[in-house]
């Protein structure tokens, strides 16, 4: 892992410490092209949004040779939770964190959208309950990871984003994509809420922060402010 070294002088003594940078990896799932993210530091792995390629996700986690300590969900549409229980069972049931507003959707195909008629080609997704509900705008510290959960509803009722200030990045789920935004024609979607959440919670982050969305390529806050047609 890379290191940042800092120093200062106090009472003629050298104080020396370091910060270990997190690395982020992505795999793309075959259903809906959903992005699953893996956050890795020197201690552990955090998984975000386990999509449909369950065995690939499990193999990727094992390749890091570190414990999986948490699974974070940006929202609970089926393409973001498809392999949730498969991954839990493969890694001794790490705790799952979810928005309280969408917690019941984990076991409801109608609410997580896998039960819609247009999705007859996939199984109904039914997952076990999550262990934890997010506390919005409260800092989290998990095995060396530090992040804050931001409310970004609009694509779904309880959608959230995760900002890692030390690593200058934000994972936005299906709220903000490169040069577009999440769909707002789904149950519980609301266009005005989505635009407001992006403006208030994401566009107030530093311009250079990297954006990792639930589908498609990464981008930056600056690029989306300047090039996203929904904000011009």
Curated annotation (Swiss-Prot):
InterPro entries in UniProt: MBL_Glyoxalase_II (IPR051453), Metallo-B-lactamas (IPR001279), RibonucZ/Hydroxyglut_hydro (IPR036866)
Binding residues for Zn(2+) 1: 75, 77, 155, 174
EC number(s) given by UniProt: 3.-.-.-
Alphabetized UniProt keyword annotations: Hydrolase, Metal-binding, Zinc
Record bears the keyword Hydrolase: yes
Cofactor: record remark: Binds 2 Zn(2+) ions per subunit.
Listed CDD domains: metallo-hydrolase-like_MBL-fold
Positions bound to Zn(2+) 2: 79-80, 174, 215
Family to which this protein belongs: Belongs to the metallo-beta-lactamase superfamily.
Full protein name: Probable metallo-hydrolase M6_Spy0554
Organism: Streptococcus pyogenes serotype M6 (strain ATCC BAA-946 / MGAS10394)
